[in-house]
Every structure is written in structure tokens, then in C-alpha cells.
């Protein structure tokens, strides 16, 4: 396939166009007076949202060159969302402003590497500042307050999040599920586990918006070996298909023909499945698979040592769970189908091993297993009158939970873009003997005004006046309330941000902006001429895969 290479001023113009597009599209949603965006969907009616992250992911520019840069800019929002669960729109506005300012310096023939160096020096100083002004939160009451603020003042949501954290610990596993009742909003602790392994292939994803796999009442197939052939699994998988249930395969690895066949079957809609690599290595992997077997109630697992093959399994041998959630980095098993007495016996066995071992390393790993197996999972159940209302409430609770976790982890800072604005004073003291590096510092310094300016503009006020007044006050806790249109104390008014969200938004923005500042060329494929033929996914059954 032929391609096109662009560089120089043409490339800079494409980068500017992409940055302008994402900022103008997502920026309008920022702040309490942010405006909604209507998005057309490939199925169903249009969606109205104030979620900048959703808007960014919906952008599909017709110009292939602009589309590639938009894709790269999306990494800033994805990084912010993955690491902190929020701050995506702030990251977008920051990176857009940095690119806009960097273009002037690139046009003036400044050293791009020195610009990058200055930007990173500025980033490091601002991160130190954010960490220095962050206020730690510890009590259940403070956690409830942060949760309430994160949920736009909903004290019930804040209270339930605090209750859940109190039950399983601040580092414990908390999931949000759809409830059955009209006004249901409850907290319960069930048997469960989370481990640090995600899906083998992103093609298994069932929720593209959150980039996760979600299954209700799935089977769990465990294998302490690599699975590379699909044929031995066909009879079992055909039975699972007829039961209209999903299956999660947790194995040493799933590769080759087995992985390809599972992915294609999932994409065709004939099988709901996901493959996950088993946690740990060697003997430790065997022990963790046994933990999962007991938790899920599986009768056995595939193992050469045990003489158990995939062909010999029936659905009665598989484990079950009320739900399983899988991201690219982790797997959460909620309410496994194992017997409580068997789980308690396993916990007792691990405790005995901890007492007997003399190795600090082994003791640490055993304690990790104990925490995973005995800690349980807190489940927040959210109900509503309609499916739309339940989804909206569930999304709101999940957003508040992410923000609260971030706040518990690194503390809270004044919100509304005020913390980044006050960090300008720190960069005023940061200087470089190299003019080009100083220009890089100034790129970040100028960008720190952008988020609060966008919030103020969305509220219909003059951003230049507001930012000037706040900088002149030299009070880091003084912010502008964009809803009430007045200056207030951030902590007294409850307008705060998790420090982690602000930090990650800045780091993500500088990371992506630095790449674009130093980029010399862009290669895109040229459209191919239509010769009347088309490439299609093969339909019907696949050879050697039975009827699923």
C-alpha cells in the first residue's frame, strides 16, 4: 500500500488543526457550567454528554493525517483516565495549549530537544508543588465528604463510598453493579478476588467505552498450562454456547489457534469468552490457580501433573462467579461460586504457611494471597426507574469512586483549575541559562492558565479578569466558583480536586506534547482505489470449530 510522508510546516499545521479540534470539542464540557455535546451513535439515537473523555473518543476526522494526530492526543486522556479515573478534559486542554504555544517557538527555529527539556523541568516543579499543597484525608467522614463533592454534592453517594471503603479497607476492591430495586443503593461484601492480569487480547472487550470485559454469571475454566489448540475445547465450548453463558479462561497462556478462534468467535457473536493469563510464575502460579479454583467452586483444573485434560472437562467441572470484570491490567472476580467452608479452610492453610515460613519473601507473597482470598469485594448496587437512569446513576457512582480513591491516595487540592494557576508562581522562580530551554518552561507556564480559563469562559465570564484577580491575591485556597460566579475559599466551599487527578493530567499532557514537539514527520497510508472487491470476515462456522 502506498503512503504519504509529511513534515515541516505542513506537519505543524496538521498538529495545530488536530489540537484545535479536540480542545474546541471537549473543552466546552469542562466545569460546572460546561455545555453538553450531542454525539451520533452507530446504533440507537444520539447521545447527549458532558463527558469530555467520551467526546474525545467519538472524534473521527475525515482527514487521515489529522485523525492520526487526534489518535495520539487521545493518549493524554487515556493515560489520565487509566491512572486517575478523571482529569481527561483538563489533560486535553493542557496539551492543546502547549502545542499551540510550542508552534511559535518551532517556527522561530528553536531547538526542539531543548523545548522538551524545559517542559519536563517545568512539569517536575509543578508536580512537587501539587504534592506540597495536597491535604491528606483519613477519616470515614472526610472520605464521605470527598465522595459527595466528587458526585456533585450528592451526600448519599459519598456516604456509601465511605461505608464500602470502611468495610474492605482503602486499598480494598470495590465494584459498582446495577441493582434491581427502584431506589436501591446498597453496600455488601461478597467473596471475591482481584489479581494483576488482564485480557490477552483487546478484541475480547465488551464495553469499549471503559475498555473492559464485563460478564454476569460466567463459567471459569482454569488451566495450569498453555492452551494453543482449539479442537480439544470444542465440545465444552459448544455446551457453554447452548447455555447462553460466558466463559473466562484463566491459563498459563492462551495462544496460536486457540486464541485466534476464541477472538473470531467472540467477534462473530457466537461465543462470549475472554482469555486471561494466570497470575504468578511456577509453583506460585499453581498455588494462585488453586486459590481461584476454590473461590469459584471449580471441581478441577487442567494440568499435566494432575492428568486432567481439556477434553475430559464438562461444564460441571468449571467454576462460576456472579460477575467478572477484566481490564487490560487486572481481573476482578465477584462473588465466586465456591463453598464458604472450603474458602475458610484454604485461608487457614495459608495462615499456617505464613507462620511456618522463614523466608521474608515467601511470607510477603503468602500474605498477598491471603489478602486477595480473605479480603472480599465490596459491591455497590445502584437502582433506578429506567435502564437509562440506572446507567446514568451507575456512571456517576463509578466516577465518584475513582475520584475518591485518588483523593485517599494522594490527598486533595483546591479545584476549579486553581491549583495549576497558583503553580505559575513556582515556575516564575524556575529559570534556565539556555533561551530555548527557558522557552520550554514558558510553554508549560502559559498552559497552566488554560483549564481555569476554559471553566470561566464556559460560565460566560471574562477569563483574563478572573485569572488576574486570583494571581494577584496570592492565596492558593482562593478560587472562582463558576456556578455561583463569586470568589470563595476552596475547602470551605467544597470545590476540590484529588491531587492525583491534577498531577496525572499535567504529566499526561506534557508527555504527549513533548512527543509532538519533537516529531519530524508523519507517515499515512494513501487510500486505495476500489477495484470492486471487498474483504469480509468469513461467515458461518469455521473448520474444526464445531457449531459455535
Curated annotation (Swiss-Prot):
Name of the protein described by the UniProt record: Chaperonin GroEL
Protein keywords: ATP-binding, Chaperone, Cytoplasm, Isomerase, Nucleotide-binding
Quaternary structure (record): Forms a cylinder of 14 subunits composed of two heptameric rings stacked back-to-back. Interacts with the co-chaperonin GroES.
Keyword DNA repair: no
UniProt binding sites for ATP: 29-32, 50, 86-90, 416, 497
Family: Belongs to the chaperonin (HSP60) family.
Catalytic reaction annotation: ATP + H2O + a folded polypeptide = ADP + phosphate + an unfolded polypeptide
Function: Together with its co-chaperonin GroES, plays an essential role in assisting protein folding. The GroEL-GroES system forms a nano-cage that allows encapsulation of the non-native substrate proteins and provides a physical environment optimized to promote and accelerate protein folding.
Location within or outside the cell: Cytoplasm
GO molecular function annotation: ATP binding; ATP-dependent protein folding chaperone; isomerase activity; unfolded protein binding
Class of this enzyme: isomerase
An individual GO BP term: protein refolding
Gene Ontology cellular component annotations, sorted alphabetically: cytoplasm
EC number: 5.6.1.7
Source organism superkingdom: Bacteria
Main subcellular location: cytoplasm
